[in-house]
């Protein structure tokens, strides 16, 4: 799959599909004819600086602001015509989470569950499960007014879990969190994905988003400049995706490495050292290739493409190093 731009139509199996989506405020264009699709179970990132159009795009998906032109579909529903249906299936975590500060965490979730029409028994089961999954069981009976921002964000995810939302839309979810809280929150997002939830998140914190997103759309001035996986964007923008170094003894290793699918270049650095440029992380394939020619593998390492370098090259024209090391 190659990187895409805003003119690429969404895939037919998309659970969220936007086509030519546009939002104008008078003469100002906040979102300019964007098209994209998000598949079931995918973590998709809307990335870009503040004011790039990410939040406005989210609000149109939720039916919370009018669409000027174009269309968007969420699980087959038109948010402009059926906002309540979208709300029933989608969990939304805004940049500033709104809870009743005078109520406890459990009471806030109980209020949400009651509005959903759940029985008392079902409410209790879902709330206990949600609080456990976001690690808030011990503070379930504390007032939300005493919560840190990180705890509020986790409570927001708990509400999405209580709803059993098919899609979770998270607007700048890690903004303002300390490093440890950020790590914990990103892991919770990964857990949602493993449970089959489709996740759309917006952020300007590139390194954090790179850890969890399957694909990203890079926003600038209301338009999608590029879209795809980080590896795909790296090949298109930086000319390389993953760089894998192999240290191994044996004959015919370079030739065997060059036959691995996704490898675009193999360099011989010394008698037993090789560098591969590839569209994906090919370390398992490289190890198998060395074994296949009866070689002796000594070391494997990979340099991953950096989303920050891709972003800088795309939007700022900076010629930065295109990799982030990971042994």
Can you describe what each PLM-predicted range is?
Residues 5-14:
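Primarily ABC-family ATPase nucleotide-binding module
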Residues 13-18, 23-221, 226:
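ABC transporter nucleotide-binding domains
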Residues 19, 75, 269, 301-303:
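Solvent-exposed beta-strand sheet faces enriched in polar/charged residues
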Residues 91, 108, 117, 156, ...:
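A generic structural signal for secondary-structure junctions
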């Amino acid at each position: 799959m190659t990187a895409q731009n805003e003119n690429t139509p969404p895939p037919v199996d998309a659970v969220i599909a936007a086509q030519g989506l546009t939002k104008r405020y008078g003469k100002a264009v906040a979102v300019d004819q964007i098209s994209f699709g998000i598949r079931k179970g995918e973590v998709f990132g809307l990335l870009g600086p503040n004011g790039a159009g990410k939040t406005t795009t989210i609000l149109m998906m939720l039916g919370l602001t009018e669409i000027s032109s174009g269309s968007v579909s969420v699980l087959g529903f038109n948010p402009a015509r059926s906002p309540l249906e979208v709300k029933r299936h989608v969990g939304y975590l805004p940049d500033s989470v709104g809870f009743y500060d005078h109520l406890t965490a459990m009471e806030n979730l109980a209020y949400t569950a009651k509005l959903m029409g759940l029985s008392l028994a079902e409410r209790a089961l879902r709330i206990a499960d949600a609080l456990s999954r976001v690690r808030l069981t011990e503070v379930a009976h504390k007032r939300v007014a005493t919560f840190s921002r990180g705890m509020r964000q986790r409570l927001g995810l708990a509400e999405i879990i209580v709803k059993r939302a098919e899609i979770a839309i998270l607007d700048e979810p890690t903004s303002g969190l300390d490093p440890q809280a950020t790590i914990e929150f990103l892991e919770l997002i990964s857990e949602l994905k493993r449970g089959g939830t489709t996740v759309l998140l917006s952020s300007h914190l590139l390194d954090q988003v790179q850890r969890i997103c399957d694909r990203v759309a890079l926003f600038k001035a209301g338009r999608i400049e590029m879209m795809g996986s980080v590896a795909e964007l790296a090949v298109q923008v930086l000319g390389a995706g993953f760089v894998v170094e192999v240290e191994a003894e044996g004959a015919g290793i370079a030739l065997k490495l060059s036959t691995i699918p996704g490898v675009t270049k193999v360099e011989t650095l010394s008698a037993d050292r090789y560098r591969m440029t590839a569209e994906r992380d090919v370390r398992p394939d490289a190890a198998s290739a060395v074994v296949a020619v009866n070689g002796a593998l000594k070391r494997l390492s990979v340099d991953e493409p950096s989303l920050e370098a891709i972003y800088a090259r795309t939007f700022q024209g900076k010629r930065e190093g295109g990799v982030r090391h990971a042994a």
